[in-house]
């Protein structure tokens, strides 16, 4: 139910934003991005470069005003880390994970440029800020003795046990994306740029590590021996109840990328309502309907 509510909210926001943009401003862009993804959590507290993975995305951008744009984007990336890393402070715990991230985001972009310039006469280099809302899916996994396991299904912190253990966490979550970027005008229709965007999540389980070690005997009885092995890789027989993670600190992930965007006018959609977007008539030729 919660997942459906978030999906409906994003759909409604997208519909309203892009309908307004096409009706009033008449400029829309389509683009691609590629770059690096990383994470911060129990297994890596500093977005360590060692754990950087590749990510890519597609996006569409609608122009409200010269300084305000709205962007709908899809991102696919991967995050991961392990306790045996170069800067790890918890080698004894000996845990590791990796997870794909699939994200759909809606953000507002504020560009630092001259409001009186038309689109084709926009600044050569334009910095911007952005913030919005996103829904994403993840699924932490690990490889043990040559086999890959989905950790959420294992219940490494006793999620499927009887008693006062945490409930199984959802693999669909919401995040708050925000960051900074820049755009470089390549041609009248093309922009090339770079961006660094952080995602604040509301889950501490991107890495499947959050609370305490469960009772080994109870975990073995209800989930099997493999659950015990994946829960406690330190082989500490007295681990029950000891701290495994920190539930007070939610996990983060970041996407740093280069992107390319191609802009078209809504004259392609037989709409010529561009006067507010292009106050200096720099795109007047784009607003004139072709003669039959």
What spans do the regions from the language model cover?
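Primarily recognizes Gram-negative and organellar outer-membrane beta-barrels
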Residues: 22-55, 63-102, 120-122, 135-175, ...
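Transmembrane beta-barrel domains of outer membrane proteins
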Residues: 59-61, 109-111, 181-183, 261-263
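Interfacial segments of alpha-helical transmembrane regions
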Residues: 123-127
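Internal transmembrane alpha-helix with an interfacial aromatic "cap," most often the third helix
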Residues: 103-116
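Membrane-embedded beta-strands of outer-membrane beta-barrel proteins
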Residues: 58, 106, 129, 178-180, ...
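Bacterial Sec-dependent N-terminal signal peptides
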Residues: 1-26
């Amino acid at each position: 139910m919660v997942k459906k509510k978030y999906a409906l909210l994003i759909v409604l926001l997208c519909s309203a934003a892009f309908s307004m943009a096409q009706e009033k401003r008449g400029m829309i862009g389509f683009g691609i991005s590629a770059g690096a993804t990383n994470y911060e959590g129990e297994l890596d507290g500093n977005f360590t470069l060692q754990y950087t993975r590749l990510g890519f995305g597609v996006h569409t951008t609608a122009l409200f005003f010269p300084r305000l744009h709205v962007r709908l984007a899809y991102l696919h990336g991967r995050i991961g880390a392990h306790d045996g890393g170069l800067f790890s402070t918890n080698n004894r715990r000996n845990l590791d994970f990796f997870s794909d991230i699939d994200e759909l985001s809606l953000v507002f972009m504020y560009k630092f440029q001259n409001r009186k310039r038309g689109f084709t006469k926009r600044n050569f280099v334009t910095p911007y800020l952005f913030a919005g809302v996103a829904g994403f899916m993840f699924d932490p996994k690990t490889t043990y003795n040559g086999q890959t396991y989905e950790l959420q299904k294992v219940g490494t912190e006793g999620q499927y046990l009887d008693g006062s253990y945490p409930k199984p966490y959802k693999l669909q979550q919401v995040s708050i994306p925000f960051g900074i970027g820049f755009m470089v005008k390549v041609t009248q229709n093309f922009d090339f740029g770079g961006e660094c965007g952080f995602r604040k999540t509301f889950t501490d389980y991107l890495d499947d590590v959050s609370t305490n070690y469960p009772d080994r005997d109870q975990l073995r009885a209800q989930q099997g021996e493999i659950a015990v092995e994946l829960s406690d890789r330190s082989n500490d027989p007295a681990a029950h109840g000891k701290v495994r993670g920190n539930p007070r600190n939610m996990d983060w992930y970041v996407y740093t990328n280069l992107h390319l965007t191609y802009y078209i006018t809504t004259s392609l959609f037989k709409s010529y309502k561009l006067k507010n977007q292009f106050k200096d008539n720099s795109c007047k030729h784009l607003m004139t309907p072709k003669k039959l």
